[in-house]
């Protein structure tokens, strides 16, 4: 079969570094009996070693040329191929018997919306291991008060404990991306550290708070909360959103929800 030409519209950069591949597979630690789903298998760099540890692997792939290659190499009872866009894929449909392990070298051009989509399945996965742009991983694991801290940070840390595992240089891929990459581990919280009364309200409030990063909470949340609300929670409305902890965002969300029910 002829060489596959990476397609820019699908954000294809194929992992080829044997050390990085081994490190990711070791971190996933797939065992027989696990239900593992690989997102964007590409040319099979992770697929092959994962199948050495598993009797069956699910993959989600949008590129029909790659699907044809994978189908020609692996029998369907071992590699279950789901053709489609990961952004619209129902991962919950594969978790009807047990939670999933998700892994993948995620397409960099859709990484942020894909992470938000995957976060909705937190209660149906045991862990996730992803290759992403280093700058996205920096945002995921950021602490309050730093420039990388934002909406993605808050909403993912609400659901997951996250750990950067390894940084990956551009030359580990073909073609090399223009950015550095990193591998992150995401483990859903067994119990939410700061549960919100309404998670949709929390998501909306956090998005509004970060709508203009350089403005204060008073400005960004005008119409949501007033100075009396901030005072009742002991939160200075002159603070900027990136200084707030996850707990403080949950307090603001719950306060806003209480006002709506009055």
From Swiss-Prot:
The UniProt entry, under InterPro entries, shows: KsgA/Erm, rRNA_Ade_diMease-like_C, rRNA_Ade_Mease_Trfase_CS, rRNA_Ade_methylase_Trfase_N, rRNA_adenine_dimethylase, SAM-dependent_MTases_sf
Q: Which domain of life does this protein belong to? A: Bacteria
Keyword presence, Transcription regulation: no
In terms of Pfam families, this protein maps to: RrnaAD
Ligand binding (S-adenosyl-L-methionine) = 13, 15, 40, 61, 85, 105
> A GO CC term?
cytosol
Keyword Methyltransferase among record annotations: yes
Task: Name its cellular compartments.
Answer: Cytoplasm
Sorted keywords for this record are:
Cytoplasm, Methyltransferase, RNA-binding, rRNA processing, S-adenosyl-L-methionine, Transferase
Q: Which PROSITE patterns match?
A: RRNA_A_DIMETH, SAM_RNA_A_N6_MT
**Top EC category:** transferase
According to UniProt, the reaction catalysed is: adenosine(1518)/adenosine(1519) in 16S rRNA + 4 S-adenosyl-L-methionine = N(6)-dimethyladenosine(1518)/N(6)-dimethyladenosine(1519) in 16S rRNA + 4 S-adenosyl-L-homocysteine + 4 H(+)
**Molecular function in Gene Ontology:** 16S rRNA (adenine(1518)-N(6)/adenine(1519)-N(6))-dimethyltransferase activity; RNA binding
- Enzyme Commission number(s): 2.1.1.182
Query: Which cysteines are cross-linked by disulfides?
Result: none
Would you identify the family this protein belongs to, as annotated? Belongs to the class I-like SAM-binding methyltransferase superfamily. rRNA adenine N(6)-methyltransferase family. RsmA subfamily.
User: Its function?
Assistant: Specifically dimethylates two adjacent adenosines (A1518 and A1519) in the loop of a conserved hairpin near the 3'-end of 16S rRNA in the 30S particle. May play a critical role in biogenesis of 30S subunits.
The protein's name = Ribosomal RNA small subunit methyltransferase A
Report the source organism.
Laribacter hongkongensis (strain HLHK9)
Q: What is the lineage of its organism?
A: Bacteria, Pseudomonadati, Pseudomonadota, Betaproteobacteria, Neisseriales
